[in-house]
Amino acid sequence: MNDNMSEQEYRSLEKEVQLDDLDFSDLEAKYAVNSDFGMDNYVVVDGAPIAPEAKVPILIKVLKKLFNTVGEVVEGDEGIHMPLQDGKSKGYLFVQFKTPQMAEAAIQQLHGKKLDQKHRLLVNKLSDIEKFGAEGNVEIDFHEPEIPPFKSHGYLRSWLQDEQGRDQMALHFSETVGVYYNKKKNDPEPVIEPRKGFTSKYAKFSPLGTYLFSVHPQGVQSWGGDGFQSITKFIHNQVRLIDFSPNEKYMVTLSPLPIALPDDPAERSIFPFGPESNGHKLVIWDMATGEPARTFALPPHLEGQKDMPWPLVKWSHDDKYCARQGPGALAIYETPSFQLLDKKLVKVDDVVDFEWAPAAVHLSDSKVKEGEYILSYWTPESSNQTARVALMQIPSRKVIRTINLFQVSDCKMHWHGEGKFLCVKVDRHTKSRKTFFSNLEFFKVTEKDIPVEKLELKDVVFNFAWEPRSERFITISRLDDGNQNPSIAKNTISFYAPQVSSKGRVTSSKYTCFKEIHDKHSNTVCWSPKGRFVVVATISKSSGELEFYDCSYEEDKPANSKVNGNVKLLKAEKYSGMTNLAWDPSGRFVAAWSSSWAHSIENGYRLFEFTGNMLKDNSIDHFKEFIWRPRPASLLNAADRKKVRKNLREYSAQFDEADAMEADAASREAILLRRKLLEQWRSYRAKHAANGSKKNEVQAEIIEEIKEEIIEEKEEVVE
């Protein structure tokens, strides 16, 4: 072609040439670009070890094996290219996959992958180099990030400042959740307007009552403050179960769906999980930041299991440690790093279950003033080994006590709330395996050498409950005689206590049954959080009953009793639709309810005093749940509590007056008028007494006499 041809001549010539008649197939074949091997098939990997040239083939082999776990790397030298400089690798490489989808999977699953202690791989698209490396695509100048203004949620424990000291409860009915103050016989007082659509599944308070949680398909939402404002959103798709550490520092969530990183980069930038969480289902959240602290995959034996054991993560009393159970091992983590204790598992062959002591344990030979962290676990019998229950001290992992058991079918561990005692309920069988019975093994954890007291029984114990702040306990048992007809009342309620002296001191380590009630249908024990009073209930599909007992009844107590206990049935109430019951934190009231989650019979709730007197019977269609709001531990020290007990009569009169005002409007007006007149009289006296008295005047002594009339007298025993 003539280089001096003008543009006009060139265009004229182009029109004359018929390109359709020309065959370009040989050129197209020679210079064809395979669309399957575009830039989307490549990833660039940073953070790889810098190795000498002689060791580069070995490093490439290791990395290729890793990347083949998420896709298929192209064979040959084209699959992985690792640049060299000065006889060693430069710390990054290029990987070519067969499809863009494989490259995307590598980014999602291996970005942030820890190769060893010093190297973490950073995997990105090769096209991102062009995107972010081109001039003008990324700002060079630094701009201060925009920090949103601080938003106060108010005092999160404001309900504790209620002048009347009332407890709150949440009522869940239909699609609505409301929070109310308990007003005894009167209708509950709304704290907030009941909210429709508040939760998709259920609502739950945190252990100390600071937060209320709602569960949704997108995750979990926390609420708190005076008006239950939105606090934090925890994104976990299709979450089903939630649990909390004792001090509310952490929350655990579980979903049947594995975590999957979004494909869209914008969505991924705000997604709370990284590539290391891909495929995991169990999440531990930091409550203060709202960010995931650690995620876990489910153990293989739990995948696809319909009835999931819960909780899967168990906590020490102060949130310092948490533990998970796996096949033949316990994984114990230290917070807040959530790294394995000593970087290794605690090997326990065939471990079935474990429990943390719910309080610091003061071992007799320990020099730790704050107390020790103790957990218990048990392992079953095998062909050459007996069943075993053990106590382990953490973090030393030292096993401080074990007992061997034989002919064991099951064990349940019941720690006392103060961490001083552990009862292991051992279900045993005869050699023929046709008959079952129970033994109770009591570990006296704070005594020297941790003695173990055995209580052998003929019945099968299916319910055991310690009394709070006491060594007494209750069992419900049934004789295994082959007749399992549930309509026959064969259950026995047994009340136990240690032997004591005349001054109330424990004189024997043996437990004595001081009361038995036979031929009952009862199957549930629910102690007052303050002790002494207990509800023994029957919860079944066909019938329901609550029996209120006083376990320290003084009037009919035998003079020569060797135990600190005397049982009196205060009242029995039928409640055929009952599905659940719970004490309020003060130990003054009991709520029992019939949930529409179980059936549609008499849905609603009933409120009782601790003596069994029914205060309220409220039928509510589609009623689901009654939830008392927990309280944190009292701030009063021993001296403060002693002062309260000393002035209990004075406080009792004030409470009776407040109750009278609340119960009757006329009484309220009379009491307020009396207070007003008394205040006017005191003001008048103060005004004229200031003028003083004249000289030589007869000095008069004013005697003020106030008479009190007792309208009603009620006696309450405060432990």
Swiss-Prot record:
Residue ranges of domain RRM in the record: 41-128
Which keywords are on file for this protein? Answer: Coiled coil, Cytoplasm, Initiation factor, Protein biosynthesis, Repeat, RNA-binding, WD repeat
Q: Which segments carry the WD repeats?
A: 194-233, 234-295, 305-343, 346-388, 456-501, 517-559, 573-618
List every stretch annotated Sufficient for interaction with HCR1 and TIF32.
1-102
Gene Ontology biological process: formation of cytoplasmic translation initiation complex
Protein location: Cytoplasm
One Pfam entry for this protein is: RRM_1
Q: Which InterPro entries match?
A: EIF3B (IPR011400), eIF3B_RRM (IPR034363), Nucleotide-bd_a/b_plait_sf (IPR012677), RBD_domain_sf (IPR035979), RRM_dom (IPR000504), TIF_beta_prop-like (IPR013979), WD40/YVTN_repeat-like_dom_sf (IPR015943)
Annotated region (Sufficient for interaction with PIC8), positions in chain: 1-228
Cellular component aspect of the GO annotation: cytoplasmic stress granule; eukaryotic 43S preinitiation complex; eukaryotic 48S preinitiation complex; eukaryotic translation initiation factor 3 complex, eIF3e; eukaryotic translation initiation factor 3 complex, eIF3m; multi-eIF complex
PROSITE patterns reported for this sequence = RRM (PS50102)
- One Gene Ontology MF term: translation initiation factor activity
Q: Which domain of life is it from?
A: Eukaryota
Q: Which ranges of the sequence are coiled-coil?
A: none
Q: What main location does UniProt list?
A: cytoplasm
Family classification: Belongs to the eIF-3 subunit B family.
Q: How does it assemble?
A: Component of the eukaryotic translation initiation factor 3 (eIF-3) complex.
* Task performed by this protein: RNA-binding component of the eukaryotic translation initiation factor 3 (eIF-3) complex, which is involved in protein synthesis of a specialized repertoire of mRNAs and, together with other initiation factors, stimulates binding of mRNA and methionyl-tRNAi to the 40S ribosome. The eIF-3 complex specifically targets and initiates translation of a subset of mRNAs involved in cell proliferation.
What name does this protein carry?
A: Eukaryotic translation initiation factor 3 subunit B
